């Protein structure tokens, strides 16, 4: 099914906060990466800018854990795509997210030379 994707990530020492667990921004980033990777299977483009990303943190994620993200496309329109996802450590639900992404149109290349 090209409208869903499962990815795994490792919660390393680099992701650890002062409480000794993975900081929330890492989980948000994992969802953003998974959603962004899913867009590649939905059309002929390699970039889909994030318009909105909402993450709910349900449980602390210990350092060393493997985080499994399961994401799916809810809608893929001409200009906007919507996604939902869940994150697990083992079988325990640790977070959820929803995201909105812009469907790419031909972008003008930013020219730094004048």
Language-model regions, residue ranges each:
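Residue-level preference for beta-strand/loop junctions
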Residues: 3, 47-49, 65, 79, ...
């Amino acid at each position: 099914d090209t409208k869903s994707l499962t990815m795994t990530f490792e919660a390393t020492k680099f992701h650890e906060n002062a409480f000794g667990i993975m900081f929330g921004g890492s989980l948000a980033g994992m969802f953003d990466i998974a959603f962004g990777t899913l867009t590649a299977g939905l059309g002929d483009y390699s970039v889909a800018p994030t318009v909105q990303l909402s993450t709910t943190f349900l449980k602390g994620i210990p350092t060393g854990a493997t985080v499994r993200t399961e994401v799916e496309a809810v809608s893929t329109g001409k200009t906007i795509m919507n996604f939902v996802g869940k994150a697990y450590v083992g079988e325990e639900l640790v977070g959820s997210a929803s995201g909105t992404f812009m469907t790419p149109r031909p972008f003008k290349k930013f020219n730094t030379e004048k």
